[in-house]
């Protein structure tokens, strides 16, 4: 479909989701990033983008995706998605804080 010029947020979300299911977060992330570029209000795509980035070893980028998704979810009134992304974001924040050397925290 992409080769035929039929790009869209749903197609990119679906491709990203399938790559994630196959365990290939590195290939999933660009499709999910394109999904949110095509439809910035696509809450589910923000959530999956955060997951793909986290699984791909990009915690800072995952945190940014979750935060953007939380903003979208709040604006749209999607409380459940916002709560889920908030939980994932907090986990990443804790992991990042634990990885920081003590001298950086002062």
What are these regions (language model features)?
Residues 4, 38, 55, 72-76:
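Structural marker of alpha-solenoid helical repeat scaffolds
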């Amino acid at each position: 479909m992409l080769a035929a010029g039929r790009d869209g947020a749903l197609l990119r979300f679906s491709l990203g989701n399938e790559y994630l299911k196959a365990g290939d977060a590195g290939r999933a992330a660009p499709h999910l990033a394109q999904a949110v570029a095509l439809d910035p209000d696509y809450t589910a795509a923000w959530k999956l983008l955060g997951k793909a980035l986290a699984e791909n070893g990009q915690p800072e980028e995952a945190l940014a995706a979750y935060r953007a998704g939380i903003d979208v979810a709040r604006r749209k009134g999607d409380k459940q998605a916002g709560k889920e992304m908030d939980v994932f974001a907090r986990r990443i924040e804790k992991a990042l804080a634990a990885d920081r050397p003590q001298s950086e925290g002062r």
